[in-house]
């Protein structure tokens, strides 16, 4: 009798590593792992994740590149709306999860999977984003969530993997790191309380730049179009290059405290150098190019758009209506912004209108 197929949304982190081993060893499924890359991983990292999947027992692994789609359908509008949840968080993981879920469920349908699985816990928002998207787009495919259903701790998962012969840097696995084009979130024991901060070592990007630097960002109709005079047709490449330029200053680090979709408080650390610089520069440019009423209504609509995106409502038709408004608002948002980079901070210096 053929084994049941399950497609697992796989990042290579602790929770999904546990899920591969558990679903194959304990449940007897053929596990097909898939990573939906939103631009946070380079080719070397993707290769390492693939090797990890096979080492854990996956029968097949797929890398789904959705970076350009993610930019065109989400990041662009988050910039247009200057979206920072609670004035702090650039909705890094929140926004990419929906597109990852769409890619994963489409892959599951493509290979004829019986089930789809993810490694989300029962405490956060990702479980809702995955479940809701899966249920809307493929209600006939069952959903398996081992980490949530068994209320597992990270310590338990580490011990389980050790007992089953899987070796890794388990010290590093003590932190849940979600890396994407629009920022990286970091969760660990410190984020479970309100009076602790993440250690420097928990951040993937370390502060190595000590000399201040002045850079310029160019925008055309609201979109990032140039860095230091270099023009970019590929907006994803512009974001990646700006991240490489600014991340060594440890810019864009913060702790976000917010209300989860399920109604409890959540706390997470993040680093997002490029997103924070782009949003700040874009907003400064808009002050010169939009009327006060355009700015006012865009602030209201942008807040709603960010809230809906955060709460797994991307597929709600009103989101397309809001995007049409945001597109219209950017017709005159063209110019250059000068920024000074310093360790742990930045200063907006000047905005030049083209």
Regions found by a protein language model. Name each.
Residues 2-353:
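Nucleotide-activated chemistry modules centered on ATP-dependent adenylation/adenylyltransferase
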